[in-house]
Amino acid sequence: MFEKLKKKFAEIFHRKKIDPDEVADEIPLKLVEADVSLEAAEDLASLVRNKLKEDTTLDPNEVLSSSILEMMPEYKFDVLNVNKKPFVVLFLGINGTGKTTTIGKFAHYLKRNGKSVVIAAADTFRAGAIEQISLIGREAGTEVIRHDRGSDPSSVAFDAIEHARARNIDYVLIDTAGRMNTNKNLLDEMKKIKRVSKPDLTLLVIDAVSGQDSVNQARMFEENVGYDGVIVTKLDTDARGGSILSIYHDLKKPVLFVCTGQGLDDIMPFDRNWYVRKLIPEPENETA
């Protein structure tokens, strides 16, 4: 996980003599190869240069850690401790990001922590989508509210929320269609679902291996629908590791959860300190 970005940092910082300007010049060149956007890489370079120049005795790895954390503001939100019932979560994302399976993992996470959940199968367009979310809901032990294929997605979301209210269910998770992110009809439908369901939290699901395309997708969703935070999937297959840093820097949105594998249990709240620890090179590899 994140091997490429960690290797790039090692190439830059594993030397006995650190020159702040040389390091700052190298950071953008190397980090764009690991899915860090140029803007994020340049800002990181500037932070590192300034810190090293202010105090030449600082440990380079500590400078790197603190600089990355500075670019990733802490966002305190505990989805398990909310003061509304039902708490409605709307999921956005294009096909292929793992959105539907992520909803199953999210439901499992909530149930594992003693919460009751219902899923709204509001992707009524894609062939097999209703069956897929129904199967995933069954695996997660969660009821799925579904209508026929081609029915109004907003009605599915509305019915799921009413179902939750009537039965005192804690959370409603709404699946949505994920066809091409430039499809105007799809985006208009998502706006309608959001208007009808009035979600308490809107999450964008993007995968870690799509690189800069993930950031472009996220910008499009923000401009057209709006969302509060991000779930990053497929971290177990992400050898580069830079997309999370780019999301924080370029989109000014927090990563709230990450998915680290195929199983229902492979989801966890995102911890920026965990992320930084994964990136920092081991000191014993130091070279001249």
Swiss-Prot record:
Sequence similarity: Belongs to the GTP-binding SRP family. FtsY subfamily.
> Mind telling me which GO cellular component terms the entry cites?
cytoplasm; plasma membrane
Instruction: Indicate the quaternary assembly.
Output: Part of the signal recognition particle protein translocation system, which is composed of SRP and FtsY.
Name of protein: Signal recognition particle receptor FtsY
The top EC class, named as a word, is hydrolase
Binding positions (GTP): 93-100, 175-179, 233-236
Sum up the protein's function in the record's words.
Answer: Involved in targeting and insertion of nascent membrane proteins into the cytoplasmic membrane. Acts as a receptor for the complex formed by the signal recognition particle (SRP) and the ribosome-nascent chain (RNC).
